[in-house]
């Protein structure tokens, strides 16, 4: 017991132990899933315990509480979201350095593509990890020219941003983290597509930083983020009124507003969420998928948690608008693209959101959530 305590006092060893436990729990043959599933639910909590016991990291329950709530609600509603806690742990480790958070994300994007593309193309990943994954089934990035081009643009913009921002160095456990995340997020083509857009926008911001004062647009960016979230629900509620402008917008969005209105008419918005099946369909085998990430989030986690997260999100963006409007831009992009993409606000699919949110929660000295 004393040996174990001495081991976990070292932050790097504690992180390594957690990665080993997580990997063991993840790489299990499908026939053993019913046996291993309870273990997979416990593993992230073991990770939090290991990190919490390290003397170099100080966290409080109020700081961890939002992520634990998201994790719990996700488990209850069938969301496999062990990655939430993994990202929380990474956020804790890099809580004092915002550059480290973004450095981790951009290195992750780069290595994610470099590592997973050839493995998926050769069929190695498909045969050993996740059989039903859409991206891997089609050869992932290397099969379709547009996906390969997207991967190439992502790599180049990521590296250029790292170079311009002088974020080219990363500790060894940071590389370990992104390698593990690459394995956990093999099937998240949507996440990579969104990160590409974020990379391009950040690249532009880096280039024009000397010529444009983003502080002048901080208030607009801050108001635009909650306004985007509110607009999604407003359009859903107004759709049955047969307003010409909303009907045209619904056609432009391939009927997504109509699907949201149908879901609201049939199910309202549950207080504690619904079990969303594969493909984000409410009814298995029937296409009534909620293609809006904002609307989907309220169904997956429930109205109560959505209001809580929305309030936290709004407070965070207000704080950022006063200190660093640079970071509001990718958050706004996520919200806007979240109107038509169904998983962009799901923390499992997008490490950018949880890292940015965590960074500002933890950088508030003495503040509670």
Q: Where does each model-flagged region fall?
A:
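Long extracytoplasmic/lumenal interhelical loops at the membrane interface
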Residues: 245-301
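Hydrophobic transmembrane helix bundles of membrane-integrated enzymes that assemble
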Residues: 2-29, 36-244, 265, 285-368
């Amino acid at each position: 017991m004393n040996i174990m305590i001495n081991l976990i006092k070292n932050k790097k060893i504690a992180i390594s132990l957690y990665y080993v436990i997580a990997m063991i729990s993840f790489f299990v043959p499908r026939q053993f899933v019913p046996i291993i599933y309870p273990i997979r639910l416990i593993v992230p909590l073991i990770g939090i315990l290991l990190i919490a016991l390290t003397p170099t990291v100080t966290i409080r329950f109020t700081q961890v509480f939002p992520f634990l709530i998201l994790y719990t609600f996700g488990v209850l509603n069938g969301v496999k979201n062990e990655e939430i806690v993994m990202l929380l742990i990474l956020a804790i480790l890099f809580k004092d350095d915002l550059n480290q958070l973004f450095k981790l994300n951009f290195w992750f994007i780069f290595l994610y593509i470099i590592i997973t593309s050839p493995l998926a193309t050769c069929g190695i990943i498909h045969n050993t990890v996740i059989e039903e994954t859409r991206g891997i089934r089609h050869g992932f990035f290397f099969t379709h020219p547009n996906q390969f081009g997207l991967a190439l643009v992502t790599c180049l913009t990521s590296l250029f941003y790292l170079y311009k921002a002088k974020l080219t160095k990363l500790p060894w456990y940071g590389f370990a983290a992104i390698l593990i995340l690459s394995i956990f997020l093999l099937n998240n083509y949507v996440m990579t597509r969104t990160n590409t857009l974020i990379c391009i926008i950040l690249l532009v911001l880096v280039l024009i930083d000397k010529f444009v004062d983003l502080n002048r647009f901080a208030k607009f960016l801050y108001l635009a983020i909650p306004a985007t979230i509110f607009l999604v629900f407003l359009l859903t509620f107004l759709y049955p009124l047969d307003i010409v402008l909303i009907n045209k917008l619904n056609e432009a969005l391939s009927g997504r507003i109509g699907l949201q209105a149908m879901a609201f008419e049939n199910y309202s918005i549950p207080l504690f969420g619904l079990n969303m099946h594969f493909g984000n369909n409410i009814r298995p085998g029937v296409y009534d998928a909620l293609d809006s990430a904002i609307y989907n989030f309220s169904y997956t986690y429930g109205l109560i948690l959505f209001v809580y997260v929305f309030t936290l999100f709004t407070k965070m963006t207000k704080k950022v608008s006063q200190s660093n409007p640079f970071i509001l831009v990718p958050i706004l992009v996520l919200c806007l693209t979240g109107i038509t993409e169904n998983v962009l606000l799901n923390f499992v699919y997008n490490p950018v959101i949880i890292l940015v949110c965590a960074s500002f929660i933890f950088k508030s000295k003495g503040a509670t959530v």
